[in-house]
């Protein structure tokens, strides 16, 4: 029998958030760990750049060292970890596919009993930038990235496989019943019209384009100018912002600018009750929409 979740039950269910914090190098993304409870947070370190949080007392997985110890490519380790965190995926149509029940069984034998994860409420992954590089390196040596005609590397094939791998990995993590937060580098470039463009430093445009559909929250951690002309760090949380930073707030509980504190941000989302849709769906009086005639 199909289980239809009642509205009252759904309203009482635990709030878990999937989010990504993007920011320039050195802005303090990894240091957001200090705002999280070390007793219930697992730090997945792909960067080997944890100097800023070396005294943080929570649990940590050193992805590079563990992959090296298990004699696995870094990307294969990351995929196995996502499977271990999320369990078998109903999106896997055969037992030979990644994230299938067979894959999950193999991963549990490799990593151990997944009950070890029960104590964690939040998984903090540093970073999606490095994950995409590891994925691309792996994709470049797969058969799909080698031309059948010439036997030479096929760049288009490699990037096509990269999109599949990254989106599948992120989707697997999306369905983990825990808070999932990733951090990544935010690049600043200038286009042909001398306009500033902010974009995630992630290999493959397909992955970048898929992010808003996967994550609940996309936060840009950036430097802004305060009312006194001084510089300050801030979280930019709304898609419509005057600076063009990538951002999204599915919770509808956040202001345009929030203090740069992930722990406080999560508490606000968990406690917030947006009620009826808070989006402003009306058009400005002087907009082009009001001038259209039949």
Outline where the language-model segments fall.
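Conserved P-loop
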Residues: 2, 14-106, 116-122, 129-134
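Phosphate-binding/switch region of NTP-binding enzymes
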Residues: 178-259
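A general structural signal for short secondary-structure junctions and capping/turn motifs
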Residues: 11-12, 32-35, 113-116, 172-174, ...
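C-terminal regions of RecA-like/P-loop NTPase motor modules
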Residues: 1-3, 13, 17, 228-294
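Glycine-rich phosphate-binding loop of ATP-dependent small-molecule kinases
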Residues: 10-13, 179
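A short, compositionally biased domain-edge/stem linker segment
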Residues: 2-9, 108-111
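P-loop NTPase motor core
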Residues: 118-210
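Amphipathic coiled-coil/heptad-repeat helices and related helical stalk/stem segments
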Residues: 4, 26-29, 165-166, 204
């Amino acid at each position: 029998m199909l289980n239809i979740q009642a509205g009252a039950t759904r309203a009482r269910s635990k709030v878990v958030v999937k989010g990504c914090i993007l920011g320039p190098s050195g802005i303090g993304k990894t240091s957001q760990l200090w705002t999280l409870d070390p007793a219930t947070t697992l730090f997945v370190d792909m960067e080997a750049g944890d100097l800023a949080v070396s005294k943080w007392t929570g649990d940590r997985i050193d992805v590079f060292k563990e992959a090296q110890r298990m004699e696995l490519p870094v990307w294969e380790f990351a995929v196995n970890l996502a499977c271990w965190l999320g369990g078998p995926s109903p999106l896997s149509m055969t037992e030979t596919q990644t994230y299938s029940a067979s894959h999950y069984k193999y991963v549990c034998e490799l990593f151990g009993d997944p009950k070890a994860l029960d104590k964690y409420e939040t998984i903090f992954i540093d970073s999606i930038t490095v994950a995409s590089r590891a994925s691309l390196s792996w994709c470049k040596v797969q058969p799909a990235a080698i031309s059948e005609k010439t036997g030479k590397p096929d760049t288009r094939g490699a990037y096509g496989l990269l999109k599949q791998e990254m989106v599948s990995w992120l989707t697997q993590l999306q369905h983990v019943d825990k808070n999932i937060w990733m951090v990544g580098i935010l690049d600043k470039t200038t286009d042909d019209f001398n306009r500033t463009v902010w974009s995630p430093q992630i290999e493959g445009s397909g992955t970048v384009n898929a992010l808003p559909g996967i994550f609940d929250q996309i936060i840009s951690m950036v430097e802004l100018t305060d009312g006194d002309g001084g510089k300050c760090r801030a979280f930019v949380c709304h898609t419509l912002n005057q600076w063009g930073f990538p951002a999204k707030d599915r919770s509808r509980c956040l202001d345009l600018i929030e203090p740069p504190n992930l722990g406080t941000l999560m508490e606000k989302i968990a406690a917030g009750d947006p009620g009826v849709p808070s989006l402003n769906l009306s058009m400005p009086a002087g907009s082009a929409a009001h001038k259209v005639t039949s």
